[in-house]
């Protein structure tokens, strides 16, 4: 039996999120520094044994430095105490509608989440590297992770929505194939 190790290709991947602002428009942000490692027994990912993802809070970018600084503060992600968001996959199902189950930790709070996954396939690039592509999407409640900042407008409206939409375009690079002795 072999064990295949995969890591993220950061130049061909992006991790983005969206949240309602004033309930009339959407603010989009992304994380510029992130990593993902995975282990599978085959190239089809149905045998995924490990999926570990991290995003650095300090790399958040919403195209507004003042807002980014506020998001890093204790009002939101508390980046000083919790410098990373982590996701640890527990199960992957590549059926008609792919699902990735795992534990997401934001600001020190861990919750189980289910993400929708579209497997784009496997290809070899011009440099001989084997790559796998995925689109990952999901929704979470920021309040379930203890992010409850909620300024109110002068008319009593909500400044920020609770629902956060996650969208990631992931390209993984096959790193190592290790032969494991049968147990």
Predicted ranges, named:
Residues 1-183:
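Low-complexity, acidic/polar, glycine-enriched regions of mature
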